[in-house]
Amino acid sequence: FFDLKDKKLNILEIGIQYGSSLVLWNEYFKNSIIYGIDNTDFIKDRLDTYPRIKTIIQDAYRKELTFNLPLFDIIIDDGPHTLESQIKFINNYFKKLNKNGKLFIEDIDGKYNSNELRKEASKFTDNITSIDFRSNTNTEDSLMLVIQNDLDAHYLVT
């Protein structure tokens, strides 16, 4: 992210739990607006002290939620890490990417889910990269998928 550090970006993370990663993004991307969506509000008061962090307390995987969101440059799925939620993430949020924006899906469980998610993402783009951390972590849920939008957002059907 070094080349993006000083740019004005819209960044969204789904699954914010204690809010630590939003605070990290807020500190690193000094000119960006950071959005976080979670279905629990126990951390919202703490995050309200950061003017560039916007929190939304809802089910992030409901398509209706995305209608009123702006376009983003980076969208990270750190939600429940289920195949079902990750497929919904691709289908609901790819359309919310600016040109060259990227979706990041963390903690993908095993090769089977990676193949399923690649298949789903290929409906939108061929620019899909897998990052495999399994040899470093010795667990099966250490795959990440990066999906990039190569189209101008206004060409995407909502």
Describe each PLM feature range:
Residues 1-105, 109-158:
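A short alpha-helical cap/connector motif
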